[in-house]
Regions:
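Glycine-rich phosphate-binding loops of nucleotide-dependent enzymes
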Residues: 1-239
Length: 239
């Protein structure tokens, strides 16, 4: 059953259709990939889902309830969390405090400070950052800053997590660790919608993949179907 659905979602910037009449869905417990060349509209679609942008046309529903045009904080508290293409952490705050902010803000609004601290500590262990809990976020490696963003997003207690290029800029070992983290998140019962350019990763972790090109959905299917799609190959290789 879909946890997230979009119908005819459209967003223009001036005369440019960044996202054009796109339908999409993410089912409970699924990892769904979103791929496409740079400028295809992937991050714009995430911004529309999360409330950072408002569609010109179309509707977006979460758990059957329309969220089109709601403010980001309302969508977050309904159970949708995200990370960002460019890492956004509170640079001068310790790692633990970054996650605490998510715990205090999320779906269980009103959590006590003691419970929030316990939840933040658990999540740092979950993503592998327990050893650097007192380190300022600005002093982390890129890979660990990305893990911190994931932990902070998870601290809001989401049912759906949007991951925007979690693996960009990582070395092969870090990519493998990130793939394992996504699998663990799915095993926690959280649906994941992931933008990624690391094709080996996207083909390995996703149940289904959607392809955008010039703001339009041009293909959707299993990893095997996408990997063997002539349309997708032409978009990526220019044949």
């Amino acid at each position: 059953m879909p946890i997230l659905e979009g119908a005819g979602v459209t967003k223009h910037f001036g005369g440019l259709a960044a996202v054009s009449h796109v339908d999409f869905s993410v089912d409970d417990g699924q990892v769904v990939g979103l791929i496409g060349p740079n400028g295809a509209g992937k991050t714009t679609l995430f911004n529309l889902i999360s409330g950072a942008l408002v569609p010109k046309e179309g509707a977006i529903r979460f758990r059957g309830q329309e969220i089109t045009g709601l403010k980001p904080h309302r969508i977050c508290r309904m159970g949708v969390a995200r990370t960002f293409q460019s890492v956004q952490v509170f640079a001068n705050l310790p790692v633990l405090d970054n996650v605490l902010l998510g715990s205090l803000f999320g779906t269980r609004n009103g959590m006590s400070a003691e419970d929030a601290a316990g939840e933040a500590t658990r999540l740092l262990e979950f993503v592998g950052l327990s050893a650097v809990r007192a380190t300022p976020a600005k002093d982390l490696t890129l890979a660990n800053q990305k893990r911190l963003e994931v932990a902070r997003a998870l601290a809001t207690r989401p049912e759906l997590l949007l991951l925007d290029e979690l693996m960009a800029g990582l070395n092969p070992t870090e990519v493998a660790q990130a793939m394992a983290l996504v699998a663990r998140i799915r095993d926690q019962g959280i649906a994941v919608f992931v933008i990624e350019h690391v094709m080996k990763a996207i083909m390995s972790i996703c149940d289904r993949i959607m392809v955008l090109h010039h703001g339009q959905k041009i293909a959707e299917g299993t990893p095997h179907e996408i990997a063997t799609s002539r349309t997708v190959v032409e978009v990526y290789l220019g044949e």
